[in-house]
Amino acid sequence: MCHAIEFIETPLFTRQIKQLATDDELLTLQRELIAFPDKGDVIQNTCGLRKIRMATGTQGKSGSARVIYLLATREIIWLVLAYPKSAKENLTEAEKAQLKKLTALLINEV
């Protein structure tokens, strides 16, 4: 049986994704996460954040954008960050520490 998934965007994600992707590209990502919510790789030391590749424009997934998300419950996915791969390959330990704090806040929201 299929269940509904609610996507909640952080304000930062909303600003970032508008610069990176079209509405259709974001919809494609959301459909992918509905089908496979745990598809993204877990990012160590962030309390469960995941990173997934997202195709944008004419670039494939490997060279385009990265989306950081939190599978908070079976019904709620927080879209936290989006950035071009060319700007950043991996998060720094300091960024992970900040995201870990944010993750705790987001989990308490649901």
Which residue ranges define each predicted feature?
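Sequence/structural signature of beta-propeller domains
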Residues: 3, 28, 35, 48, ...
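Compact soluble domain cores
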Residues: 12, 21-41
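Amphipathic alpha-helical interface surfaces
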Residues: 9, 25, 29, 48, ...
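Enriched for short, Lys/Arg-rich terminal
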Residues: 70-110
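Arg/Lys-rich, positively charged N-terminal/basic patches that mediate binding to nucleic acids
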Residues: 1-24
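Residues that form generic nucleotide/phosphate-binding pockets
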Residues: 16, 32, 102-105
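Basic/aromatic recognition patch in beta-strand/loop cores that engages polyanionic ligands
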Residues: 39-83, 87
